[in-house]
Regions:
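Extended, compositionally biased alpha-helical segments that mediate assembly or anchoring
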Residues: 1-38, 285-373
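Alpha-helix boundary/N-cap detector
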Residues: 4, 25-32, 36, 132, ...
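Assembly/oligomerization interface modules of large self-assembling protein complexes
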Residues: 35-117
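Intrinsically disordered or highly flexible coil/loop and linker segments, enriched in small
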Residues: 50-51, 147-154, 158, 260, ...
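Long, contiguous amphipathic alpha-helices that act as assembly "spine/axial" helices in icosahedral shell
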Residues: 102-173, 349-351
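Flexible metal-binding regulatory segments at protein termini and peripheral loops
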Residues: 126-130, 207, 363
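Tryptophan-rich substrate-binding surfaces of secreted polymer-degrading and adhesive proteins
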Residues: 174-226
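Extended oligomerization regions of viral-like shell subunits
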Residues: 185, 193-194, 214-338
């Protein structure tokens, strides 16, 4: 009886399974058969995956007519005292009380994109064994139109979140210092020279309407903004717990009436459509290192969805998360069509997937960016 040791078997297999015979990009034709015919390919196939956009919550409705999005916002009304019957303030009954409108904003088309592929005639059939393989190969070619668009949409959403981050950071980085003797238009971002705080003009400010930054805030001309928190990336227990504490504070604010957490600084009503987008490599640290369990809804104290993202497009690499009201971040498809044409002379058919989108960011919904120093 012959015996083979484990090591002997490993050595035999190592000499048998040769790398040059596996996953190579070239093939040497062989005729190892009695008739001297070319040895046939035994299996022809393609391993394909599912290209899925895992952020459907950022899909806006299809815009069939018109591609520009116009957003307006009417802010809260200040209460006033009711005059007495004998106060002679009769004119106030017929006075025009203009709505407290915030600046209107626009999101325009990102312009059309085209995805193109070709299927040659009298070509693939030369290589396959049967009709099923031919149909499968052609289907795979045309399927890539849809797969490629899905991948593009997915990446556009990363970039759209990144653009939201950029706008928040830009607002909190303004270098325009508030001067009491200068008039400012609605929507102007300003900086306080003393506290280094940032704010936005939410009521038309005329020269000397206030005596200081604090006075302008008190009188309702300036809304202080809190759009960015600079905090250590959560990679261990200490930094993870610090981030979760800050997140809980911000989620609480989002679930109540708040102001200063949008690009317009307007008053925001409570919302249940909040979601935290965080870099995918950080959730493992938070789940393992932090006992509080950052992403358990009962631990966050208020329901908030969590979505892992690969990145935030080309935004600052120090950004690792953003908390947003998903109603204010949408990608709208405005056109989709697939056309084809045939080249009869050369013998192939072209397929073209036409698509167009409008990316929308609200200036009036909750946003909070988290970044490293």
């Amino acid at each position: 009886m012959r015996h083979v040791s484990e090591q002997q078997l490993k050595d035999i297999v190592a000499k048998y399974v040769l790398g040059e015979k596996i996953a190579t990009t070239s093939l040497t034709i062989t005729r190892d058969n009695a008739l001297g015919l070319v040895d046939t390919i035994g299996k022809i196939f393609m391993i394909d995956g599912d290209f899925v956009d895992d952020m459907p919550e950022l899909d806006g409705e299809f815009l069939s007519y018109g591609k520009t999005i116009e957003e307006y916002f009417i802010d809260l009304i200040p209460p006033m005292d009711k005059p007495d019957l004998d106060s002679e303030k009769y004119a106030e009954a017929l006075k025009y009380y203009a709505p407290a409108n915030m600046p209107t904003s626009y999101s325009t088309t990102l312009k059309p994109k085209v995805l193109a592929t070709s299927v040659p005639f009298n070509d693939i059939n030369r290589a396959v064994h049967n009709e099923d393989q031919l149909v499968n190969a052609v289907t795979k070619i045309t399927k890539k139109l849809s797969d490629s668009e899905t991948s593009m949409i997915w990446n556009i959403k990363f970039q759209l979140l990144g653009e939201a981050c950029k706008k928040c950071i830009d607002a909190m980085s303004t270098t325009t210092t508030f001067a009491v003797a200068t008039a400012y238009a609605l929507g102007t971002y300003l900086k306080d020279s003393d506290s280094n705080a940032r704010g936005i003009i939410v009521k038309d400010y005329k020269a000397n309407n206030a005596t200081s930054w604090a006075d302008a805030v008190t009188k309702g001309y300036i809304q202080v903004l809190d759009l960015v928190t600079t905090i250590a990336k959560p990679v261990d227990t200490e930094t993870g717990e610090a981030f979760i504490i800050q997140l809980k504070k911000d989620v609480k604010k989002a679930k109540r009436i708040s102001s200063g957490y949008s690009l317009n600084g307007n008053n925001i009503g409570a919302t249940s459509t909040m979601k935290l987008y965080i870099l995918e490599d950080l959730t493992a640290y938070l789940d393992v290192k932090v006992e509080a369990g950052a992403f358990h809804q009962d631990k966050v104290l208020a329901p908030v969805g969590v979505k892992e993202v690969r990145d935030f497009g080309d935004a600052d690499a120090k950004i690792f998360a953003i908390l947003v009201d998903t109603r204010g971040v949408k990608l709208h498809r405005t056109y989709i069509a697939t056309y084809d044409n045939t080249n009869g002379l050369l013998g192939f058919i072209n397929y073209f997937r036409h698509c167009e989108y409008t990316a929308f960011l609200s200036r009036n919904t909750f946003m909070k960016v988290y970044k490293e120093a």
